[in-house]
Amino acid sequence: LIEQCLNTGYEDWSQLLPCDRALAVPSEAINPKHPYTKSIANSIGWQWRIPLQHRTGNGIVYCSKFSDDQAAADILINNLPSSALSDPKNLRFNTGKRKKIWNKNCLSVGLASGFMEPLESTSIHLIQSTIMRFFSLFPHKNDFRVEMNYFNNSIDEEFSSIRDFLILHYKLTTRDDSEL
């Protein structure tokens, strides 16, 4: 709705956050179960490992310019902590955000507003922040341009800050085994 009807536009951040693919695969549960997600850097991107009650969630995030799906799947499967429970599921995404999260009478929330990458689970925070910010500015009159402009400016700052935080993960590393 916000794109097809309102032509809001999308800011492409793929030059800043080049990872645009992920593969996800569950594996058998591991013990001991650690109460945290493990992020593991590798030569094509990074992997996640999330111990759950009855299985382990695993995935790899990478840039399609530097690796193909099969190479990523091989790295992922070879680094699983236990046997895979299914074939990897391929996920594709475009990093960036809507030019306006609130446009006229339409509010973009979650993946409709944008996506950076799953490294820090920032989408969960941005959903909550978007909803809370919108409710705090909820319009009580027909002309809500001031509230809408304030909302869009402040949420733009938040998206940009999170984007820059994610970029630091790649820019401050001393790794030299990857083009990322």
Question: Where does each model-flagged region fall?
Answer:
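Hydrophobic/aromatic beta-strand patches that form the interior of the parallel beta-sheet core
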Residues: 23, 89, 107-109
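Flavin-binding catalytic cores
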Residues: 54-55, 63-90, 139-149, 153-159
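Short, solvent-exposed loop/turn elements at beta->coil junctions and helix N-caps
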Residues: 92-96
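A conserved FAD-binding loop/helix module that cradles the flavin
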Residues: 115-135
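Active-site-proximal substrate-binding core of FAD-dependent oxidoreductases
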Residues: 133-180
